[in-house]
């Protein structure tokens, strides 16, 4: 009797990459938007930042919404958090003060998710500000 465990095990491990594989194929067909351009952080505060970007150079007219991915740097989990279905400008809230964050944006159309934008790193403001004491 033949064992199907190895093939099934490896197949299941690959399932989590299927959306990436599909997006790669669709990029080749030219139906996905290119990466959003000029991602910037024009305003940074203690617990929030405003993220802004321009439309993709390719297939911008097909974009339905954007996904923002962000993570706090120098932490143990270093996992990206995703906020789907947003538009520019976007207020990224509930951040920690005096912390470094990395953010990137993806454009989404009816065919799938396009290439990610360039990553942008920023630091939130410090909650405790230095004050000068006058005598």
Locate predicted features.
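Short hydrophobic targeting helices and cationic amphipathic motifs
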Residues: 5-6
């Amino acid at each position: 009797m033949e064992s199907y465990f190895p093939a099934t095990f490896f197949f299941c491990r690959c399932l989590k990459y299927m959306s990436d594989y599909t997006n790669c194929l669709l990029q080749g067909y030219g139906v996905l938007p290119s990466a959003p351009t000029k991602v910037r952080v024009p305003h940074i505060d203690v617990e929030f930042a405003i993220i802004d970007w321009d439309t993709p150079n390719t297939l911008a007219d097909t974009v339905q919404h954007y996904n923002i991915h962000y993570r706090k740097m120098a932490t143990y989990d270093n996992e990206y958090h995703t906020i789907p279905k947003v538009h520019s400008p976007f207020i990224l809230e509930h951040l920690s003060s005096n912390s470094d964050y990395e953010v990137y944006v993806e454009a989404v159309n009816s065919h799938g998710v396009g290439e990610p934008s360039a990553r942008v790193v920023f630091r939130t403001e410090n909650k405790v500000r230095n004050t000068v004491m006058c005598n």
